[in-house]
From Swiss-Prot:
One of the primary rRNA binding proteins, it binds directly near the 3'-end of the 23S rRNA, where it nucleates assembly of the 50S subunit. This is Large ribosomal subunit protein uL3. It comes from the Bacteria. InterPro entries: Ribosomal_uL3, Ribosomal_uL3_bac/org-type, Ribosomal_uL3_CS, Transl_B-barrel_sf. The gene is rplC. It comes from Burkholderia mallei (strain ATCC 23344). It holds the Pfam family Ribosomal_L3. Belongs to the universal ribosomal protein uL3 family. Methylated by PrmB. Transmembrane segments: none annotated. The keyword Transferase does not apply.
Amino acid sequence: MSLGLVGRKVGMTRIFTAEGDSIPVTVLDVSDNRVTQIKTVETDGYTAVQVAFGSRRASRVTKPLAGHLAKAGVEAGEILKEFRIEADKAAELSNGAVIGPDLFEVGQKVDVQGVSIGKGYAGTIKRYNFGSGRASHGNSRSHNVPGSIGMAQDPGRVFPGKRMTGHMGDETVTVQNLEIARIDADRKLLLVKGAVPGAKGGKVFVTPAVKTRAVKGAK
């Protein structure tokens, strides 16, 4: 239950430490996160903060949503995202407030959620790293097939979740415990160490890490 930011994946680059070490980073644009609603236990049954990100033409906004945003005094956004937070943290915010990258600090571990790049219809070798069949020696048509999926008479069916060919990618993926390497407060950018899910321009959600790793050897 932590407040986070909605961002846009700009791309990857690298930065250098004072010692000259190269660090690969993903640049996330987290500008203009604005509060559209504060939900409370009394009115909604739970405590949360609703945030708008990006922009959207007025002609693309439904009348109910337009009224909702007008009540908060906030322009329409491309995305509405809700973050569950504690009641005391919600009390510090108000409709129309802008949440910036100063929500995080350099060195902090975060979880980044996005939608992975779609790969289309893929076979089991590409999708699940299956091994291929023999190139010859009696194999004429089954080089890349996954093999039998059948079961015995009992249970007499294929279990759900069987790894087979199908649509690869385009799934919600969360990468945990990424480190914030640098923050550009002027341009409202987060530079996160490592790669995050999705293509350039994709939307991501950045929240404080839930399962922070313990330092090896620490007491």
